[in-house]
């Protein structure tokens, strides 16, 4: 019964996506891997978000390690955010999932491995350069900057990839709200998926 329910949900989601203009490509076992960047592929970076209190003008600098927990707190308080510093990649060492990314490239090929970040799209050049410095080469178009830190934004992006025919999807992110949002969406699809929270040892 559970399998039938999932299939019905899957068809309903597909029908809804088709109405919204997505086109589906039928392919057998098409795998992909999606990695967050900060605190996942890279740690100890020197970038920061500037959070401004619209009432008082008070500014707080939030680094990428603090962002997953501090960001939602400040957003709830009405703070406004400036991500300009995240166009660059400053500092940083190998993150906990960098080797996993290399493994997934060997398994699925570089064209099926993606970086999905809340940084702006303008950061793609710097991210690409940093990855290349680590011996990682994926197509430049596979680096997506959403300029949006909401988990739903990443979930919607994953749905787009599902509509392109991917049916074996791996996603990893350090921010629990992102992990939950993506897992909630992928669990409704009749596909193989694995959603992981990146943790620094």
Q: Predicted regions span which residues?
A:
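Low-complexity, glycine/serine/proline-rich disordered segments
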Residues: 1-32
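Residue-level detector of alpha-helical secondary structure
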Residues: 7-10, 14, 18, 102-105, ...
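Alpha-helical substrate-recognition element adjacent to the catalytic core
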Residues: 18, 28-152
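Conserved Lys-Pro-Asp/Glu-containing loop-to-beta segment of HAD-superfamily phosphomonoesterases
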Residues: 28-33, 154-177, 182
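Extracellular glycosylation-rich, acidic/polar low-complexity regions of adhesion-
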Residues: 44, 196-201
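A structural signal for isolated positions on well-ordered beta-strands in alpha/beta enzyme cores
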Residues: 112-114, 170, 194-196
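Cofactor-binding loop segments of dinucleotide-utilizing enzymes, especially the Rossmann-like FAD-
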Residues: 118, 174, 200
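Short, surface-exposed basic-aromatic patches at helix termini and helix-loop junctions that form
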Residues: 129-137, 158-164, 183-192
